[in-house]
Amino acid sequence: MKLRAVAVLVTLALTACDNPKPRQIPPDPMAKALPPAGPVAPPKDGMTQGLAKRTEVASFYLDRVGEALDPLNKQPAGTPGDAAILMSGFGFDPVAKAPAKGVDVVIDGKAYAAAYGAAREDVANYFKTPGLAATGYAVTLPAGFLVNGPHKVAVRVIAADGKGYFESPAIPFTVD
């Protein structure tokens, strides 16, 4: 019995493929392309002014700050200031488990409106909630918009009913 098992293992080892098929790595849904070179308009003022801050934890993720991917978990997060800075991720109402009315990106205490509703099938699949498929956000800051040095960014997710917002913790980053 042992001899037969050894023979099977040896046969399998000898017939194993030394050149496996090349596999395509699927694109990272969270890694949005960098903004194109060229003029970028300054971001619009945020939408959360006058809304009540909710106490619940925001359901959000900040995928990138410029060239820094996953700045929440990979510190120090740094990006050059001589190019446009894309900040993107996803956010949704954690209480309603539904898309938000919008998202603001708050940089050093100033809120800027983000484009909201980008496709994020990965979010819908992860949370097993098909209604969260359009919860992506992005805001692009023009080159030179932020001075070199340390900054903090937070994400404000506007509740689905539009009556308040959920705010993330501040995430530090540096513009070089």
Regions found by a protein language model. Give the residues of each.
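Residue-level detector of transmembrane insertion/anchoring sites
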Residues: 8-9, 98
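Bacterial signal peptide processing site
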Residues: 18-20
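Intrinsically disordered, low-complexity segments enriched in small/polar and acidic residues
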Residues: 23-32
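Long, low-complexity serine/threonine/glycine- and acidic-rich segments characteristic of extracellular
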Residues: 33-86, 90-176
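Short intrinsically disordered, low-complexity segments
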Residues: 9-11, 37
